[in-house]
Amino acid sequence: MSEKITPLSKTLTRRTFFQKIGGFITTHWLLTSTPFVGAGVLGWAGHDTLTLRHRQFDLFYPTLPNALEGKTICQLSDLHLETLRISPDSIYKSVMVQKPDLIVITGDIISDRTDLDKLNPYLGGLTAPYGKFVVMGNNDYSHLSHTLMKRYLQQFKTLEWTPLLNEASYLPNLKLWIIGIDDPATAHDNVDLAYQKILSSPTTQSNPVFRLALAHSTDCLDDVVKYGAELFLTGHTHGGQIRLPGLQPLITNTYLGDHGFYEGYHVINGIPLYINSGIGESIIPLRLNVPPEIAFFTLHKGDAPPRQQEK
């Protein structure tokens, strides 16, 4: 069933929120709790921050191109390498054990210019037979000058990753379009431009293609709906990052998140959408009740509902 959401609007930034909530938690929760409760909460958060989970989905499409049957897409998001405490080896093993056919990253790889030297250890060894693709997030832009951004993008290319900045790449052997939308949060997105190549490439019912859209944030969903996608992969929310038991996240930094769509798989306005909770952290180097994740999507021909496994 497809949920309907009204047009998007601006929201409170995660940085502003965490600066406020971090002080509140410290002064009014941890410090006023007994030492045992405070230590327990911090221990829980430490465990959640370092426990990398695998979320595996089987997705079914009646018109899936035959070449995509059984193919697996791996999604990484929001690594925030500056404060990331999960090792490169852990991420490498978690990804490569699944033997993905395609790997994508949906933004916020870095949180500081010093993170540029960490790209090779974390991303250099990852391989996929049909390629590796990346889009930018707000942190990628906010911490780099124009000159450093050029160097950053070149580093990805040197490591055999393909940056997609409002452009699409076609894999003819798979009949797959990968549409990379630049970061909406910093107003670098141009969905019309990202879909330009696809609009000039005719398709028919007898020759279907699969459109995989990538963006850091869901805040460009309205425009993606206009053009269509068989799967739209995003991140940015961190699943809330700090989520108290039984409660919705206090901040998600997106319009959809404020309406309850802050992580996981949904169909919204006809678009199958996945919001990745990410791997790293922002502002506060902890996660609570939102462990880091890597997502895998295996495509099948058929009309069955999605199936999910978690490890």
Short names for language-model regions:
Residues M1-G23:
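N-terminal secretory signal peptides
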Residues T32-A67, I86:
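C-terminal segment of N-terminal export signals and the immediately downstream linker at the start
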Residues T218-A295, D303-A304:
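Conserved beta-sheet core of the metallophosphoesterase superfamily
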Residues K71-Q154, T158-T162:
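Membrane-embedded segments
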Residues Y61-C74, W161, A168-I178, V267-P272:
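Beta-strand-turn-beta hairpins that frame and shape the catalytic cleft
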Residues H146-W161, A168, P172-R211, A215, ...:
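Binuclear metal-dependent hydrolase catalytic cores centered on His/Asp/Glu-rich metal-binding motifs
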Residues G70-H80, K175-P184, L212-H216, P272-S277:
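Active-site-proximal beta-strand elements of phosphoester/diester hydrolases
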Residues L76-S77, I103-G107, K132-N138, L164-L165, ...:
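Active-site neighborhood of phospho(di)ester-bond hydrolases with catalytic His/Asp-centered motifs
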